[in-house]
UniProtKB/Swiss-Prot annotation:
This is ATP-dependent Clp protease proteolytic subunit. It is found in: Cytoplasm. Gene3D superfamilies: 2-enoyl-CoA Hydratase, Chain A, domain 1. It is an enzyme of class 3 (hydrolase). It comes from Zymomonas mobilis subsp. mobilis (strain ATCC 31821 / ZM4 / CP4). Pfam families: CLP_protease. The active site is at S107 (nucleophile), H132. Fourteen ClpP subunits assemble into 2 heptameric rings which stack back to back to give a disk-like structure with a central cavity, resembling the structure of eukaryotic proteasomes. CDD domains: S14_ClpP_2. The gene is clpP.
């Protein structure tokens, strides 16, 4: 991302001002939502983004290891190793990590969505989820291409096993479903086991109804 583009993006992020007995404090909207234990996974999954998300997960665990965390996902996917870094941190920390798809969760985005705490994996009504096998652009000498191809196959086997675990689908069904780009609507993703619920409105707690 160029500096000019980054400046434009930063300028578009709203600021929130809060009053306290110490005076006014301002936060960008994402920092304010982090206080509510909400983390956004937005855009390409890559190493820098993964580092920021892992740091936020670890910070929230240190702040309160017993309180749930929620990842809001709107991502076309990205680098497998970056996604696995986020995944492993989600599994490593003590708080339960719920996942919610808004917009899309494709490729590694769908993997992170499925890896959320069972019963806490949600998609909004008009979101879409896409699963497929990992790909790689092998180049160089024949021996190097062969090494890269073996690594892609090994990574594919590992991801298929994890998808099978999170969806409770047979590994054969996962391999078949992920052979090519496979786009699912929210209800289809629920039936497949990638998510647990489809929401069009935030659930209202019983005490709020009274």
């Amino acid at each position: 991302m160029s500096h000019d583009h980054a400046d434009i993006v930063n300028a578009l992020i709203p600021m929130v001002v809060e009053q306290s007995n110490r005076g006014e404090r301002s936060f960008d909207i994402y920092s304010r939502l982090l206080r509510e234990r909400i983390i956004f996974v937005t855009g390409q999954v890559e190493d820098h983004m993964a580092s920021v998300i892992c740091a936020q997960l670890l910070f929230l665990e240190a702040e309160n290891p017993k309180k749930d965390i929620f990842l809001y996902i709107n991502s076309p996917g990205g680098v497998v190793t970056a996604g696995l870094a986020i995944h492993d941190t989600m599994q490593y920390i003590r708080p339960k990590v719920g996942t919610l798809c808004i917009g899309q969760a494709a490729s590694m985005g769908s993997f992170l969505l499925a890896a959320g705490e069972p019963g806490m994996r949600v998609a909004t009504t008009n979101s879409r989820i896409m699963i497929h096998q990992p790909s790689g652009g092998a180049q160089g000498m024949a021996a190097d291409i062969e090494i890269q191809a073996r690594e892609i196959l090994r990574m594919r086997k590992r991801l298929n096993a994890l998808y099978a675990k999170y969806t409770n689908q047979p590994i054969e069904e996962i391999e078949k479903a992920m052979d090519r780009d496979n786009f699912l609507e929210a209800d289809e993703a629920k039936a497949f086991g990638l998510i647990d619920k489809v929401f069009d409105k935030r659930p209202v707690a019983s005490e709020e109804k009274e």
